[in-house]
């Protein structure tokens, strides 16, 4: 099932807010299974002031966080988890393959590969222009 969520609809599902909300829209959502979202990376991002002033690069940890936020939308849209919070449980196999710079459009996709009770695992991939920028296996747990 494909679903489009704008920023206001995303904010109804996850608690993140500026400056830590790192997803602009969700273009595909299969509740409890997968999601695809986008982040428009602009020169005005707060983190570019210090990372790095002469060569701005989006920190890898924030790319992973953006992927986790898309994953949170996927799992928290499932009826039994609506109104709850998804917490990071861990990160495995993280790889950073391409710099993300101002002007890039970051495509963030996640497939939830295992859910057991309130814990689960997702395979996440961030791309720019079809090239992998980062990938990781994200572990999560659902809180109250």
Swiss-Prot record:
Family matches, as SUPFAM superfamilies:
Thioesterase/thiol ester dehydrase-isomerase
Instruction: Name the EC number(s).
Output: 4.2.1.59
Under catalytic activity, the entry for this protein gives: a (3R)-hydroxyacyl-[ACP] = a (2E)-enoyl-[ACP] + H2O
Enzyme class (EC, first level): lyase
Q: Which UniProt keywords apply?
A: Cytoplasm, Lipid A biosynthesis, Lipid biosynthesis, Lipid metabolism, Lyase
- GO CC list: cytoplasm; membrane
Annotated active site residues, numbered on this chain, are: 51
- What does the UniProt entry say about where the protein is found? Cytoplasm
Q: Please state the span of the N-terminal signal peptide per the UniProt entry.
A: none
Q: What is its main location?
A: cytoplasm
Task: Note the superkingdom of the native organism.
Answer: Bacteria
Any one GO MF term held by the record is:
(3R)-hydroxyacyl-[acyl-carrier-protein] dehydratase activity
Q: GO annotations under biological process?
A: fatty acid biosynthetic process; lipid A biosynthetic process
Q: What does this protein do?
A: Involved in unsaturated fatty acids biosynthesis. Catalyzes the dehydration of short chain beta-hydroxyacyl-ACPs and long chain saturated and unsaturated beta-hydroxyacyl-ACPs.
NCBIfam families in the cross-refs: fabZ (TIGR01750), PRK00006.1 (NF000582)
Q: Which family does it belong to?
A: Belongs to the thioester dehydratase family. FabZ subfamily.
- Protein name (database record): 3-hydroxyacyl-[acyl-carrier-protein] dehydratase FabZ
Q: What gene name does this entry carry?
A: fabZ
């Amino acid at each position: 099932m494909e679903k489009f969520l704008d920023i206001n609809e995303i904010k109804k599902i996850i608690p993140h807010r500026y400056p830590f909300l790192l997803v602009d829209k969700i273009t595909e959502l299969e509740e409890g299974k997968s999601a695809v979202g986008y982040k428009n990376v602009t020169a005005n991002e707060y983190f570019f002031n210090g990372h790095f002033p002469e060569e701005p690069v989006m920190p890898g940890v924030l790319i992973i966080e953006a992927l986790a936020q898309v994953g949170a939308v996927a799992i928290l849209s499932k009826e039994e988890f609506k109104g709850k919070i998804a917490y990071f449980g861990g990160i495995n196999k993280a790889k950073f393959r391409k710099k993300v710079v101002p002007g890039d459009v970051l495509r963030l996709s996640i497939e939830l590969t295992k859910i057991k009770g309130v814990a689960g695992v997702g395979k996440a991939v961030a791309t720019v222009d079809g090239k992998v920028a980062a990938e990781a296996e994200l572990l999560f747990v659902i809180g109250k």
